[in-house]
Swiss-Prot record:
The gene is ftsX. This is Cell division protein FtsX. Changing residue 115 to A: Shape defects; cells are significantly shorter and rounder. Gene3D superfamilies: 3.30.70.3040. Residues 46-178, 258-276 are extracellular. Pfam families: FtsX, FtsX_ECD. The keyword Cytoplasm does not apply. Residues 1-24, 200-236, 298-308 are cytoplasmic.
Length: 308
């Protein structure tokens, strides 16, 4: 069994070398196909991840007017410290909503610090200026469906300047994810079909060049599985070789994109898929797809031209 495998392996490698240019064309086709598959898969999976993150961040941001001190029990008035009659009016109105899970205060100073962390040196141009941000309440909803209701009710509360919710963004992101998924998978399927076709032609040339040898093998009683072996290995090798470059690109490029993009998402409680999880799974998937389309192309040629 082992000796037969190595014999098939040797025949497959010899055939790949013999049909050099066709092998290069088939490997290049697989490489381009898998590279584009990796790109589409990265976009599809991360878009779905971001859409899920947004949906899970079932919250509304309620900004307080600058002339309202809702989170302070005392205020400065005419040089004196007096009791704040507006204390927690907005907070209590939000907290008393039946659809609200929690309400958390976020001062404009805290928001300024977060923006400084996210923007880095770009935010330094505003140093020395008055803080343009607003105090806000972060309202967490009991369920995603409650977000719009909370946002509408919050707009009616006196002292509220603006209300933001992720409903529209989530809906747009889901539409984008659906669009990318449909067209991305369609294009990937077309590319895989082209790769299978080229591999099939490469194997066909090998079959034609060895047709007499194959006929003799059949006459002396060689089993179909024995005849198929070298050709299936040849197709698998083409797929395997074509998966190497896309896998290297995934490992390097995804790390760079993650480090560049993800830090701007963290401030919004969003995140791309971690490279430690995504890269190994994507690389394994590329090799599996490569071997599959290589073997499939080989199988199609054998079925069509050998009739075995």
């Amino acid at each position: 069994m082992i000796s037969r495998f190595f014999r098939h392996l040797f025949e497959a490698l010899k055939s790949l070398k013999r049909n050099g240019w066709m092998t290069v064309a088939a490997v290049s086709s697989v490489m381009i196909t898998l590279t584009l598959v990796a790109i589409f898969a990265s976009v599809i999976f991360n878009t779905a991840k971001l859409a899920t993150d947004i949906e899970n961040n079932v919250r509304v941001v309620v900004y307080i007017r600058k002339d309202v001190e809702d989170n302070s029990q005392t205020i400065e008035k005419e040089g004196q410290t007096v009791t704040n009659n507006d204390y927690h009016k907005v907070y209590d109105s939000l907290k008393n909503m039946s659809t609200v899970k929690s309400v958390t205060f976020s001062s404009k100073e805290e928001q300024y610090e977060k923006l400084t962390e996210i923007m880095g040196d770009n935010w330094k141009i505003f140093e020395g200026d008055a803080n343009p941000l607003y105090d806000a309440y972060i309202v967490e909803a009991n369920a995603p469906n409650d977000v719009k209701t909370i946002a509408e009710d919050a707009k009616k509360i006196e002292g509220v300047s603006e209300v933001q919710d992720g409903g529209a963004n989530t809906e747009r992101l889901f539409k984008l994810a659906s669009f990318i998924r449909v067209w991305g998978l369609g294009i990937a399927a077309l590319l895989i079909f082209i790769a299978v076709f080229l591999i099939s032609n490469t194997i066909r040339i090998t079959i034609i060049s060895r047709s007499r040898e194959i006929q003799i093998m059949r006459l002396v009683g060689a089993k179909n599985s024995y005849i198929r072996g070298p050709f299936l290995l040849e197709g698998a090798f083409i797929g395997l070789l074509g998966a190497i470059a896309p896998s290297v690109l995934v490992f390097i490029v995804y790390q760079i994109v993650y480090q560049s993009v993800n830090k701007s998402l963290v401030g919004q409680n969003l995140s791309m898929i971690s490279p430690d999880l995504f890269s190994p799974l994507m690389i394994a998937l590329l090799f599996v797809i490569g071997v599959f389309i290589g073997s499939l192309g080989s199988g199609i040629s054998m079925r069509r031209f050998l009739k075995i």
